Amino acid sequence: MSISSKIRPTPRXPSRMATDHSFKMKNFYADPFAISSISLAIVSWVIAIGGSISSASTNESFPRFTWWGIVYQFLIICSLMLFYCFDLVDHYRIFITTSIAVAFVYNTNSATNLVYADGPKKAAASAGVILLSIINLIWILYYGGDNASPTNRWIDSFSIKGIRPSPLENSLHRARRRGNRNTTPYQNNVYNDAIRDSGYATQFDGYPQQQPSHTNYVSSTALAGFENTQPNTSEAVNLHLNXLQQRINSASNAKETNDNSNNQTNTNIGNTFDTDFSNGNTETTMGDTLGLYSDIGDDNFIYKAKALYPYDADDDDAYEISFEQNEILQVSDIEGRWWKARRANGETGIIPSNYVQLIDGPEEMHR
């Protein structure tokens, strides 16, 4: 049996967890940007509707299309509050941005018609729609940007829940790891510290700066005694096997006196082989390599992290693990974008670092 048939990733069906989207007012109260901007929008809308009603009640002419713009703005404000209460803002970002852009056009058009009109009542209505236009422009900047953008990160830093996860940033990290994965035996990546020591580290986490022809990210514990960190892994392994075959054949010729014993010795070369540094049990699969993480002691998981958001592992990635919001995870490595972690049920794998927060003591677990 060849080595290529021995080292294969063991598929794992990750658990899928549903995110809670029930109606909760605390989702709205926990976001200072939502409270402040929507409160200002409500005040501006009251000024606009009050001035419009006062102007229309007199004999003064009033632009009729402004009424639809005011009603449309009211629907936008109500929709935003509902999206926050059900925690669906990230799911409807495109809809929110486009609908607010339409409201911006309506209010700007109404301001053009009212700002040049005479009378204090129309002046109040024009002030209201101008304020609404400014707020709509701020909303377009926020909801139109990704959560990883500098402005969104700065605004979300004041939120009680912290910075929102970025789907774009997450997909770039996954694409980077998938792009480094090849089909040769030693190129099935188990994401670990070797990615930083292999000589192919990148300056930007989103895209590789240098794409190696071979990547050697197999656990050094599983391959103790015959690992090779040079790029030409397959050639090095072939040379190593040839040398072992010559040594075993020489020993077999000296000991064995019949052809049956020689055939048995040659057959065992493809299955297992011993080196001066091995323990005689080097028959390891990629599934066993993943299993080694389950045997790591508690001392190696010296950090604890609290999940800020629920995370569903990617179906195409056997090494990610899912976790729930506020779940406490044990972490063994806190460098890079993806951390090695272990759940309370013993499940181990990698997790995105921007979904969790390190905690120092038991009092932070209940925050």
Curated annotation (Swiss-Prot):
| Subcellular locations according to the entry | Cell membrane; Bud; Bud neck; Cell projection
Residues of the region (Disordered) are 252-276
Q: Which residues lie on this side of the membrane: Cytoplasmic?
A: 1-32, 87-93, 144-367
Residues where Phosphoserine is found: 166
Q: Where is the SH3 domain?
A: 300-361
List residues traversing the bilayer: 33-53, 66-86, 94-114, 123-143
Note the SMART domains from the entry: SH3
Q: Which GO terms describe its cellular component?
A: cell projection; cellular bud neck; plasma membrane
Q: Which UniProt keywords apply?
A: Cell membrane, Cell projection, Glycoprotein, Membrane, Phosphoprotein, SH3 domain, Stress response, Transmembrane, Transmembrane helix
Topology with regard to the membrane? Answer: Multi-pass membrane protein
Q: Matching InterPro entries, A to Z?
A: SH3-like_dom_sf (IPR036028), SH3_domain (IPR001452), Sho1_SH3 (IPR035522)
Against CDD domains, the record matches this protein to: SH3_Sho1p
Q: Which residues are glycosylated?
A: 59
Intervals, Extracellular compartment:
54-65, 115-122
By sequence similarity, the record places it as follows: Belongs to the SHO1 family.
Task of the protein: Plasma membrane osmosensor that activates the high osmolarity glycerol (HOG) MAPK signaling pathway in response to high osmolarity. Detects changes in external osmolarity and activates PBS2 through the stimulation of STE11 and targets PBS2 to the plasma membrane. PBS2 activation leads to changes in glycerol production that helps to balance the intracellular and external osmotic pressures. Activates also HOG1 in response to heat stress and mediates resistance to oxidative stress. Involved in the regulation of the mating pathway. May be a receptor that feeds into the pseudohyphal growth pathway.
Q: How does this polypeptide assemble, per the annotation?
A: Forms homooligomers. Interacts (via the SH3 domain) with PBS2. Interacts with FUS1, STE11, STE50 and RNA polymerase II.
Give the protein's recorded name.
High osmolarity signaling protein SHO1
Record gene name: SHO1
